[in-house]
């Protein structure tokens, strides 16, 4: 686990690399990251030492690839800065998000689409899960995100998400 309040992005990533390295020595593995967790996994995969086996597949659940518009809007809010720390600032930074980079691991993005609409829509009509938009979790280095009609927080607990992951892993085995 990690605490965005007390740890910066690089410190969390540095702690994650040996964990993934140990996992890789046990054989074939996959990684699943939700939201910031997916950003941390991408950074950690890119920081793995040479010769360490990469994951067979990376699943990103509502994990921003592009800077988060909510993080950008909240970046000057004292409470947001206190709670999210350096990681919250990273999520709103074009330069820092680009610096995380893409991974060469086969990647599947899964995005929620049950966010607010109308007057309370912070995403200007873009499909979203209430925290990130479909555009923010999209990239040209993997297929379009698979859409699931749920909110950001519930995405990891979604039966539909589990089915998608299991189906993709079965397809990978063929």
Predicted regions and their residues:
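C-terminal catalytic-base region of ester-bond hydrolases, centering on the histidine
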Residues: 102-174
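Serine-dependent carboxylesterase/thioesterase catalytic core
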Residues: 6-104, 124
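A short beta-strand-loop structural module common to alpha/beta enzyme folds
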Residues: 1-5
């Amino acid at each position: 686990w990690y605490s965005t309040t007390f740890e910066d992005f690089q410190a969390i990533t540095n702690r994650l690399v040996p964990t993934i390295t140990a996992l890789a020595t046990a054989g074939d593995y996959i990684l699943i990251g939700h939201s910031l967790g997916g950003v941390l996994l991408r950074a950690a995969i890119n920081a793995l030492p040479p010769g360490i086996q990469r994951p067979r597949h990376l699943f990103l659940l509502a994990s921003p690839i592009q800077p988060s518009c909510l993080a950008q809007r909240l970046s000057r809010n004292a409470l947001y800065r206190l709670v999210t720390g350096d990681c919250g600032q990273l999520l709103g930074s074009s330069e820092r998000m680009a610096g995380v980079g893409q991974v060469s691991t086969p990647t599947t993005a899964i995005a929620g689409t049950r966010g607010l609409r109308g007057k309370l829509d912070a995403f200007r009509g873009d499909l979203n899960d209430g925290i990130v938009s479909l555009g923010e979790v999209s990239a040209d280095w993997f297929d379009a995100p698979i859409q699931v009609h749920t909110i950001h927080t519930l995405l990891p607990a979604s039966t539909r998400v589990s089915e998608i992951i299991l189906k993709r892993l079965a397809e990978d085995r063929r």
